[in-house]
Amino acid sequence: MKSIQVPIILVGFMGTGKTTVGKYLSDLYNLSYVDLDNFIEVNECKSIPNIFNDIGEKGFRSLETRYLKSCLNTFDIISTGGGIIEDTNSLKLLKNQKHVVWLDCDIEIIFKRVKNDSHRPNAKSKNLNQLDALYSSRLSRYNEIAFMKVDSAQSVSEICTLIKTKLLSD
């Protein structure tokens, strides 16, 4: 049987299910997994909102790029933060990866998932229109690096089946 090539990098806007899908894929295929935001928090001993407060978004993006680089050689599956494509260095790293999977769904679904989540500094206190503007500003960059795009409004098992089928046919 053909094996799945790694790393598999999950990208997409906040609230599209990258962490959930990453964990599920990891368990399903016995592959190593890391949630990049969580990895940053553990290594920096601070929450993402506190990092944003201390060094700003630009400083956070620089940290994120550094940690992405180290995770690419260490983990089989990586779920990234939604804004990873905001940094040109991260974007370049991702462009050089073969299996970047873009999870996407309707902005109304995303809004329901992320509103009132204090752990998301770029969503906190944004209304639907403001979140949609941020979402829209990122779409072309997700598209630029994606090996495949998956509608994450489906069940996690359906999403993982689609990803597996595409990866095995590649």
Swiss-Prot record:
Binds 1 Mg(2+) ion per subunit. It catalyses: shikimate + ATP = 3-phosphoshikimate + ADP + H(+). Pathway: Metabolic intermediate biosynthesis; chorismate biosynthesis; chorismate from D-erythrose 4-phosphate and phosphoenolpyruvate: step 5/7. Substrate binds at D37, R61, G82, R138. GO terms for biological process: amino acid biosynthetic process; aromatic amino acid family biosynthetic process; chorismate biosynthetic process. Catalyzes the specific phosphorylation of the 3-hydroxyl group of shikimic acid using ATP as a cosubstrate. GO terms for cellular component: cytosol. It is found in: Cytoplasm. The keyword Acetylation does not apply. Monomer. GO terms for molecular function: ATP binding; magnesium ion binding; shikimate kinase activity. CDD domains: SK. It comes from Staphylococcus epidermidis (strain ATCC 35984 / DSM 28319 / BCRC 17069 / CCUG 31568 / BM 3577 / RP62A). This is Shikimate kinase. PANTHER family: SHIKIMATE KINASE, SHIKIMATE KINASE 1, CHLOROPLASTIC. Pfam families: SKI. ATP binds at G15, T16, G17, K18, T19, T20, R120, Q154. Its cofactor is Mg(2+). Belongs to the shikimate kinase family.
